[in-house]
């Protein structure tokens, strides 16, 4: 049962808790940032393109904090577009108003307006990132968010000699908002990107390339690469010629050491990997190519180019202009390499591993579906049918007049319905549109089987959960069956906030709903979000002030 905000006792308890929380925040260090979002002209691929960027930077400014810090980011929207910012992977405990997905937790920041996001970084360490969460703006509005151990603490691995953020992106030579608008209007998929980028630049294999990101390293040192896939729609293979990696964290969750020469990142993923500079002195390409989980079907529309950066050994014997060594990349359709990476990750060994909850309160199976719906009146260039996507047959639609979180807090009827189905619909059931959420009792344990279709071509969907990390208990190919339960890893499963559900396969996740609010659960291929591949969990309040949805901040944007 949701405890109404109008309860005078709960208001008093919340007031007392807020005073304690304010004192706690005051005692913590506060990292203050100002993001000015404006148009800027950038030259790439022999063209000049106007993009939306933060503080004139691509990637945008890096946020660096220690675990336990408070963060305040004033976002000034000087762009012509509505805008929100999402702090991807931040748990937002009791700060759901700062999560950022447009029309889920807030109305957008309108042009010539501002909003200050305030949240704490508690119980998290590693590499996360921030990005726009409205339209395709996140193609250029993104940046790294680094959380280091609090003072006096250390990494659970040998301290690196050097840390290097590597933010991977996709580049279009057209206005990305127009690209999305054209796709939605026509009911078709958006065109593929024109290039990939490493820290905002393409590298020297593209036409008119005049800038390449270079990492200068010393021999026989350990470099911590903080790799982020900020791309919109493409899974990526990542390699450095002549070097191997030891993965130590994903999605700001520590892992058991995992050695590989190929990192695989779905959109939204982060990987912390140690690289030892034990190769011969020289220069080596860092290469990025697409993993196209649809290949070789004719549905594939993936950028087939290669972005590069350079790892340069800074010695007297190394020539700066020497041609770097190129790594041998996997084939774009190499699902075996992708699955080996995703399936091979484990959580840290005991006793460091967090305990997996064993009593499950809510069991769900969510089928990820692609299909078609009739064109609607807003799709001016659509003919007959429009591409669509759904979870359990429901193609998700955002509200237009009020955010879901405001509707939950104010108990406003008519904004959403709490009838999202717990299981796939019978075969042949038509896809429907709706703003359906799944209510969860506070502190309930939820297990979800995510199933990709196996009867026709599908693709690897990176599914992102806001507000929580989850345990990945099992993954496999084909259809999930009850017999797969015996294979659950309840000892050292990896924790993530974004999971790549394999093509023609399944994955099982489990989490505890201990964070009241409205939490988006959606595909992180941005092309699939307006198509409807998402839903929302509405987590009820608990019974104590530290489990109760706080009121909205005074400067929360209005619709």
Curated annotation (Swiss-Prot):
Annotated binding of Cu cation 4, by residue: 461, 523, 528
GO CC terms: apoplast
Domain Plastocyanin-like: 36-152, 163-316, 396-543
GO BP field: lignin catabolic process
Superkingdom per UniProt: Eukaryota
Residues where Cu cation 3 binds: 133, 466, 522
Gene3D superfamilies: Cupredoxins - blue copper proteins (2.60.40.420)
Entry function: Lignin degradation and detoxification of lignin-derived products.
Pfam families (alphabetical): Cu-oxidase, Cu-oxidase_2, Cu-oxidase_3
Species: Oryza sativa subsp. japonica (Rice)
Entry's Gene Ontology molecular function annotations: copper ion binding; hydroquinone:oxygen oxidoreductase activity; oxidoreductase activity
Record-listed Cu cation 2 binding positions: 88, 131, 524
Cofactor binding, per record: Binds 4 Cu cations per monomer.
Cofactor(s) the record lists: Cu cation
Alphabetic keyword roster: Apoplast, Copper, Glycoprotein, Lignin degradation, Metal-binding, Oxidoreductase, Repeat, Secreted, Signal
Enzyme Commission designation: 1.10.3.2
The name this protein goes by in its record: Laccase-7
Glycosylated sites: 32, 47, 82, 112, 120, 151, 210, 220, 257, 278, 314, 363, 443, 484, 541
Residues in the signal sequence: 1-28
């Amino acid at each position: 049962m949701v405890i109404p905000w109008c309860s005078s006792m709960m208001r008093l308890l919340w007031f007392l808790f807020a005073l304690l929380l304010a004192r706690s925040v005051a005692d913590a260090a506060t990292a203050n940032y100002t993001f000015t979002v404006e148009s800027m002209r950038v030259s790439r691929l022999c063209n000049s393109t106007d993009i939306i960027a933060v503080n004139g930077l691509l990637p945008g400014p890096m946020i660096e904090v220690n675990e336990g810090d408070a963060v305040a980011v004033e976002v000034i929207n000087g762009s012509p577009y509505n805008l929100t910012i999402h702090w991807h992977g931040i748990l937002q405990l009791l700060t759901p108003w700062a999560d950022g997905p447009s029309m889920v937790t807030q109305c957008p920041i309108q042009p010539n307006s501002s909003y200050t996001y305030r949240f704490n970084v508690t119980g998290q360490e590693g590499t996360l990132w921030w990005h726009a969460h409205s339209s395709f703006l996140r193609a250029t509005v993104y940046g790294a968010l680094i959380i280091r151990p609090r003072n006096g603490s250390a990494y659970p691995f040998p301290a690196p000699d050097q840390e290097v953020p590597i933010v991977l992106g996709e580049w279009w030579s057209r206005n990305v908002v127009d690209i999305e608008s054209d796709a939605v209007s026509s009911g078709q998929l958006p065109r593929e990107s024109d290039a990939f980028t490493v820290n905002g630049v393409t590298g020297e294999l593209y036409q008119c390339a005049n800038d390449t990101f270079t990492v200068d390293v010393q021999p026989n040192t350990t470099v911590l690469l903080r790799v982020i896939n900020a791309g919109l729609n493409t899974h990526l293979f990542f390699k450095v010629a002549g070097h191997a990696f030891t993965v130590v964290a994903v999605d700001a969750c520590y892992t058991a050491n995992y050695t590989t020469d190929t990192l695989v990142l779905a959109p939204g993923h982060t990987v912390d990997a140690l690289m030892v500079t034990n190769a011969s002195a020289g220069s080596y390409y860092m290469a990025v190519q697409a993993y196209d989980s649809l290949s070789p079907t004719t549905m594939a529309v993936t950028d087939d180019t290669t972005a590069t950066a350079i790892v340069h050994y800074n010695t007297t014997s190394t020539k700066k202009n020497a041609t770097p060594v190129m790594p041998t990349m996997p084939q774009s359709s190499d699902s075996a390499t992708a699955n080996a990476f995703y399936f091979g990750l484990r959580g840290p060994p005991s006793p460091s591993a967090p305990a997996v909850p064993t009593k499950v309160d809510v069991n769900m199976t969510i089928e990820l579906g692609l299909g078609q719906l009739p064109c609607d009146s807003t799709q001016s260039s659509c003919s007959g049918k429009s591409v669509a996507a759904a979870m359990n047959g429901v193609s998700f639609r955002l509200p237009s007049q009020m955010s879901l979180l405001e509707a939950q807090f104010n108990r406003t009827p008519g904004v959403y319905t709490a009838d999202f189905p717990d299981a796939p619909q019978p075969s042949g059931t038509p896809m429907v549109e709706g703003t359906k959420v799944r209510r969860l009792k506070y502190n309930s344990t939820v297990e979800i089987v995510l199933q990709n279709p196996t009867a026709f071509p599908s693709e690897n969907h990176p599914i992102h959960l806001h507000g929580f990390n989850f345990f990945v208990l099992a993954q496999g190919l084909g259809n999930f069956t009850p017999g797969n339960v015996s294979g659950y890893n309840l000892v050292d499963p990896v924790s993530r906030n974004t999971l790549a559900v394999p093509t023609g396969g399944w994955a099982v996740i489990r989490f505890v709903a201990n964070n009241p609010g409205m939490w988006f659960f959606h595909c992180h291929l941005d092309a699939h979000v307006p198509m409807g591949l998402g839903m929302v969990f509405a987590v009820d309040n608990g019974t104590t002030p530290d489990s109760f949805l706080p009121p909205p901040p005074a400067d929360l944007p209005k619709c």
